[in-house]
């Protein structure tokens, strides 16, 4: 695919951020427990089975009514059309380190941590109870309307959060407000 094919004509509206995601869950209560107890979401509303087969729970992590909704009664995984991953942005790099610590404390396996190449975000990735890949990140490159993405020669892959701090790409200044988080991460390595 050519790069110019990726830039469609201007539209009369602009998508700003992911508003919400709806996931189907085999065990709705297990999902609610994961998103509330591990990730800190709060339940905003629920639909009983009489309204939606399997029930439905709406949850939030900010002032929006819901950022994620879960529908119960999911059958065995289907082929095709599955969600690849869902990413949650945080305001500070410290929060990514805090998230990693929290995930470890909750016994959640981390599938990736460090810096991704394209986008340069520093992230921790893991799965929810049904295997949906989730990401908590900070520092995603910001691009103006006419600005090109970072050239691949500036990408700085990092396989740990600590490595991401010492090998930043041009223009990214990853600093922890709380340096103790760096030592805590080393102590908690599996």
Where are the model-predicted features located?
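Short beta-strand/turn micro-motifs at beta-sheet edges
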Residues: 7-10, 71-76
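Core segments of cupin and vicinal oxygen chelate
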Residues: 13, 24-67, 188
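Histidine-centered active-site/metal-ligand motif
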Residues: 20, 66-68, 84-85, 116-118
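A short beta-turn/loop motif at secondary-structure boundaries
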Residues: 49-52, 76-77, 115-119
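Conserved beta-strand in the GNAT
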Residues: 68-71, 135
